[in-house]
Amino acid sequence: MQLNSTEISDLIKQRIEQFEVVSEARNEGTIVSVTDGIIRIHGLADCMQGEMIELPGNRYAIALNLERDSIGAVVMGPYADLTEGVKVYTTGRILEVPVGPGLLGRVVNTLGAPIDGKGALDNDGFEPVEKIAPGVIERKSVDEPVQTGYKSIDAMIPVGRGQRELIIGDRQTGKTALAIDAIINQKGTGVKCVYVAIGQKASTIANVVRKLEEHGALANTIVVVASASESAALQYLAPFAGCTMGEYFRDRGENALIVYDDLSKQAVAYRQISLLLKRPPGREAYPGDVFYLHSRLLERASRVNAEYVEKFTNGEVKGTTGSLTALPIIETQGGDVSAFVPTNVISITDGQIFLETDLFNSGIRPAVNAGISVSRVGGAAQTKIVKKLGGGIRLALAQYRELAAFSQFASDLDDATRAQLEHGERVTELMKQKQYAPMSVAEMSLSLFAAEKGFLQDIEIAKIMDFEAALLSYANSTYAELVAQINETGNYNAEIEAQLKELLTKFKSTQTW
């Protein structure tokens, strides 16, 4: 049978009219593979980087790899029941967490859900976990102190509001203890605290929460938990979630302190995710952007100026600066600070407190190595009296360490060297401090004054801790006015010096230690 051209064209038109275009929604996709918490999705042409993807069972995944014909996403939560062919949907939102003063005193997970059994959160809205750090013009230089309550740190390595001060050391050197004491010392100062626990045992975190509660510091602290049993995705995102909660206070003209415990575990979680997403590995198998991972997080800790706060609050808060101070913790292996992640974080932060195993084991706690610990901006924020009296402490310790090494080889030492060694020994002993016993500015100043002005020279080294405890007790009971004055003003002048001398002379005459 032969068809003419008219019939052929009619037949084609008829077929075209009968053809139904199956319109596939651009926001629906299908899972094509599930491996170790990473899902690969086909479809989702409109998906954005970092977007939340809705999964069955009220779960979400975050899109991290956008490839030509598929998307790599990391599941936030259990993934064992996800299979090929499951439909997923874009949400058009990036991950947000609850913020506000209602979170203070609560323990939450990475997504901001309460896990302390105290009921629902009274939050003040939601904010994204990923934010751009304030620009140069919006910042203000650091000039107010954050007192950690440790003599050795506040005298030698001072921390200012808006600073990033790294706490670095091997395992079991007192890194967490130092950070927790810094949080406890903020009680009554108006500084809001955030403690982010990454990849730790749940029992360890429970112990930290109990200690904060015992010392009355939990009421002004938010605890964000991504324990070792949580997925790598939640461990990687926990610091960003905690930072957003801290920024809420900074942007409203308040002061906040955030502790990341610790960023080594976050880097390991991020490495795991990146390798599963088949991103090319670099040094120590970390991905190429692990520096950016930490820099974009730590740059968000800053001191912002009054104009920024006024603009952010639409004129509600005027003439007040806000700050977010960060104390990131990094765990080293065998004291190796030249490994990839430690060098990265050292270069990002404004100084580091280096804790040493040898010092810790020899009973010097906090085990601060004064030689390589430094605060790059904290000096401008130091309290006047502590700055004046603590100036000779670092020098005394440095000279003592050098002379102690030298004196092992020298049989006979001259009097000046022996005096310097004895002074160094006493200062080293004085720098020891018990956990959960933070000191006020006045107490710290009194101890430093005693060391600086030679009041310890005739005290036995074994008795120095007892001498200090008795001295502080005597000062708080007999010279309460002077203690209150120093705590309030932090000033140091001839009059205060004379009063401190009188206090120490009278105390030494009592011989009550």
UniProtKB/Swiss-Prot annotation:
Database matches in Gene3D superfamilies: 2.40.30.20, ATP synthase alpha/beta chain, C-terminal domain, P-loop containing nucleotide triphosphate hydrolases
Location within or outside the cell: Cell inner membrane
UniProt enzyme class: translocase
InterPro entries linked: ATP_synth_asu-like_sf (IPR023366), ATP_synth_asu_C (IPR000793), ATP_synth_asu_C_sf (IPR038376), ATP_synth_F1_a_nt-bd_dom (IPR033732), ATP_synth_F1_asu (IPR005294), ATPase_a/bsu_AS (IPR020003), ATPase_F1/V1/A1_a/bsu_N (IPR004100), ATPase_F1/V1/A1_a/bsu_N_sf (IPR036121)
Topology versus the membrane: Peripheral membrane protein
Superkingdom of the source species: Bacteria
EC number: 7.1.2.2
Sorted UniProt keywords: ATP synthesis, ATP-binding, Cell inner membrane, Cell membrane, CF(1), Hydrogen ion transport, Ion transport, Membrane, Nucleotide-binding, Translocase, Transport
Residue numbers marked as site, Required for activity: 373
GO function terms (MF aspect): ADP binding; ATP binding; proton-transporting ATP synthase activity, rotational mechanism
Catalytic activity: ATP + H2O + 4 H(+)(in) = ADP + phosphate + 5 H(+)(out)
Chief localisation class: membrane
Binding-site residues for ATP, renumbered to this chain: 169-176
Pfam families named among the record's database cross-references: ATP-synt_ab, ATP-synt_ab_C, ATP-synt_ab_N
Coiled coil: none
Keyword Iron-sulfur: no
One cellular-component annotation, GO: plasma membrane
PANTHER family in the cross-refs: ATP SYNTHASE SUBUNIT ALPHA, MITOCHONDRIAL
Family under the similarity heading: Belongs to the ATPase alpha/beta chains family.
Quaternary organization: F-type ATPases have 2 components, CF(1) - the catalytic core - and CF(0) - the membrane proton channel. CF(1) has five subunits: alpha(3), beta(3), gamma(1), delta(1), epsilon(1). CF(0) has three main subunits: a(1), b(2) and c(9-12). The alpha and beta chains form an alternating ring which encloses part of the gamma chain. CF(1) is attached to CF(0) by a central stalk formed by the gamma and epsilon chains, while a peripheral stalk is formed by the delta and b chains.
Function: Produces ATP from ADP in the presence of a proton gradient across the membrane. The alpha chain is a regulatory subunit.
Name listed for the protein in its UniProt record: ATP synthase subunit alpha
